[in-house]
């Protein structure tokens, strides 16, 4: 999966992942800005969250 998933980059995780919309800003920006098929949010401790762009497959 490491070849498929690439972090969006910058400190965008919380802003891209916190709003409860579908599809998330993470998915929207990965598609629009990076040419990815989808994106997903990985939550860590507290507000530590990463937006990962998926270049291999569409995910809900």
From Swiss-Prot:
Pfam families: Toxin_3. The record marks 20-21 as: Reactive bond. It is found in: Secreted. Keywords: Antimicrobial, Disulfide bond, Fungicide, Plant defense, Secreted. It comes from the Eukaryota. GO terms for biological process: defense response to fungus; killing of cells of another organism. GO terms for cellular component: extracellular region. Its main location: secreted. GO terms for molecular function: sodium channel inhibitor activity. Disulfide bonds join 4-56, 17-41, 26-51, 30-53. Belongs to the DEFL family. Protease inhibitor I18 (RTI/MTI-2) subfamily. Inhibits trypsin and chymotrypsin. This is Defensin-like protein 4.
